[in-house]
A protein has these predicted regions:
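GST-like fold's C-terminal all-alpha helical module
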Residues: 190-206, 211-219
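Classical Sec-dependent N-terminal signal peptides that target proteins to the secretory pathway
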Residues: 1-18
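Phosphate-coordination/substrate-recognition cap region in phosphate-metabolizing enzymes
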Residues: 23, 27-31, 35, 75-168, ...
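ANL superfamily AMP-binding
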Residues: 69-83, 198-204
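Beta-strand elements within well-structured catalytic alpha/beta cores of enzymes
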Residues: 39-43, 116, 211-221, 225, ...
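Short catalytic helix/loop segments, enriched in acidic residues and glycine
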Residues: 58-74
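Glycine-rich N-terminal loop/short-helix segment of MobA-like nucleotidyltransferase
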Residues: 48-62
């Protein structure tokens, strides 16, 4: 557990599954498993208004705050200063993520590239507690139960009623999506099961074509990808916190195994932001 925490605070590579430097492929040719073949950039959207107000956001389509806009601009500047260019940007259907993508691509003078918006990259849906203040929710349902909904891997909040305005099926935004694919609530496990098949079907093929990919998404959808890339257990992933608007770089070998991952930018500022988000989550847990 200490090793795990060190990675997420100091960005030390986590790749315990890849123990051999070299291996054979099907053509009996040596593959260097530590050679970077593919690179992927992940980024969580900038701060949103509900982040600031301590509200369960989920699929609620809220705006970026002034801080969130500034964070996105800084992220774009960091990527620009490190000479990053992209061929495709994948994002969710939620405007806090879309606008973060726009700001970053504008900084890179790359607003012309394809921006693919898909609900599979959306934040976790918080069901009946979505849009509610976290403290008020704790008073209504009890601290222990709300903590389980927030921090367990497989326990979802109560479902929405189908006629609830918060049901995505009742939202113009999702009118072309099969209703059976739209959630009434989700656990983190449900979110992972939504994100990973999409990544494998839509994003990996583009990476294999040599495309440089930016994924701008949300805390829990990015958690799902981290769990998949780093082969984290259900218990480990619930303790991973994703800071807003810091580029997270993943490097993979030919077999799409993680070689290393790291946040991009000034190390002191990165560590301060990671510490801030971890302390904020602890404060919320204690506040409930």
């Amino acid at each position: 557990m200490l090793y795990f925490l060190i990675f997420f605070i100091f960005q030390i590579n986590v790749n315990t599954s890849n123990k051999n430097l070299l291996s054979f492929n099907q053509q009996d040719k040596y593959i260097d498993n530590n050679k970077t073949i593919y690179k992927l950039v992940l980024i969580r959207h900038g701060q949103s208004s509900f982040n600031e107000e301590n509200i369960f956001t989920g699929w609620t389509d809220v705006e970026l705050t002034k801080t969130g806009i500034e964070e996105a601009n800084i992220a774009g500047e960091i990527l620009k200063n490190n000479s990053y260019k992209f061929d495709i940007c994948f994002t969710s259907t939620l405007k806090r993520s879309i606008k973060t993508s726009f700001i970053i691509l504008d900084k890179l003078n790359q607003l012309y590239i394809p921006l693919i918006k898909d609900f599979h990259l959306n934040e976790r849906h918080y069901g009946a507690i979505q849009g509610l203040n976290k403290k008020e929710t704790s008073l209504k349902y009890g601290k222990n139960l709300v903590y389980k909904w927030r921090r367990s891997y497989s326990i979802p909040p109560p479902k929405l009623n189908e006629n609830d305005i918060r049901n995505p099926a009742n939202n113009e935004q999702y009118k072309n999506i099969n209703k059976t694919e739209l959630p009434l609530t989700e656990s983190l496990e449900d979110t992972v099961k939504r994100v990973i098949p999409y990544f494998e079907k839509e994003i990996i093929p583009e990476m294999k074509k040599g495309k440089n990919i930016l994924v701008c998404a949300h805390g829990n959808s990015i958690r799902g990808l981290i769990k998949y890339f780093d082969k984290l257990s259900d218990e480990e992933i619930v303790h991973v916190d994703i800071p807003n608007a810091i580029p997270l770089i993943y490097e993979f070998n030919e077999n799409f195994e993680t070689i290393k991952s790291y946040y991009l930018g000034d190390i002191d500022k990165i560590n301060a932001k990671i510490k801030f988000i971890k302390n904020l989550e602890k404060q919320i847990d204690n506040f409930l």
